[in-house]
Amino acid sequence: MSKVKLTRENIISLLTQAGEIEFEEDQIKATFNFEDFCGENLDSIKKMSITSCLTFLKNRQSIMKVVNLCDFTFGKITIKKNSGRVGANDMTFRRLDSMIRVKLIEETGKAENLAIIKSKIASHPLVQAYGLPLTDAKSVRLAIMLGGSIPLIASVDSFEMISIILAIYQDAKYKDLGIEPSKYNTKEALGKVCTVLKSKGFTMDEEQVQKGKEYATILSSCNPNAKGSIAMEHYSEHLDKFYAMFGVRKEAKISGVA
């Protein structure tokens, strides 16, 4: 009995015909590795400047809507609207987004680039929503990660601890962060990150634990309510007057804001 490729037509034959069918083993065992994918495809975005990468992240949702309208081609890469069964070598919007984040994080290794990224990413909506203080390279790297596919990025060497700590933080603070579980399951995302790390044989030794503590310290200083508090302070004088019209005094800060 000859083995056949795993295709739509052969799956239909498997389900509807009496003949014996087996699929090629090498195709079944083929798995996706984002780190390998990055290595093979980073050249496709090598011309993107730091500013362009940051513009992509800041406008991610709007860009995604345009890209997903139809087959989207840039250079030699095409993101198909209806990809069906996504192959290990196929580009998707999520993979593109993750590659851009990896590229930016690698750029933070240069002091000059770190300063540029730090100054520009501070205005990004998610950074403000998290109330993330940008004090050093690690905090800037966390800022770049916000809104990205953490399980994908976790597969890249040296990105393991930043990924798992951010996933833990999002799961622990999803209510404060305004994350809707029906739209983004933080527990499931954390499970995926752990699965990725286990599959690559990642060992959480003392050095990695120390790195994780540094990221956790930064995230523990986040203030998800800070953006609203700052905005209220901007209108403080007028808000006080309107509160007085209702016979009450405005609270100095939003509940939960230190």
Swiss-Prot record:
Region forming the signal peptide: none
GO MF term list: RNA binding
Disulphide-bonded residues: none
Superkingdom of the organism of origin: Viruses
GO cellular component: helical viral capsid; ribonucleoprotein complex; viral nucleocapsid
Subcellular location: Virion
Pfam family, one: Tospo_nucleocap
The keyword RNA-binding belongs to this UniProt entry's keyword annotation: yes
Keywords, alphabetical: Capsid protein, Helical capsid protein, Ribonucleoprotein, RNA-binding, Viral nucleoprotein, Virion
Subunit structure: Homotrimer. Binds the viral genomic RNA.
Similarity annotation: Belongs to the tospovirus nucleocapsid protein family.
Domain notes: The N-terminus and C-terminus are involved in homooligomerization and play an essential role in viral RNA synthesis.
Purpose: Encapsidates the genome protecting it from nucleases. The encapsidated genomic RNA is termed the nucleocapsid (NC) and serves as template for transcription and replication. The NC have a helical organization.
The name this protein goes by in its record: Nucleoprotein
Species for this entry: Tomato spotted wilt virus (strain Brazilian Br-03) (TSWV)
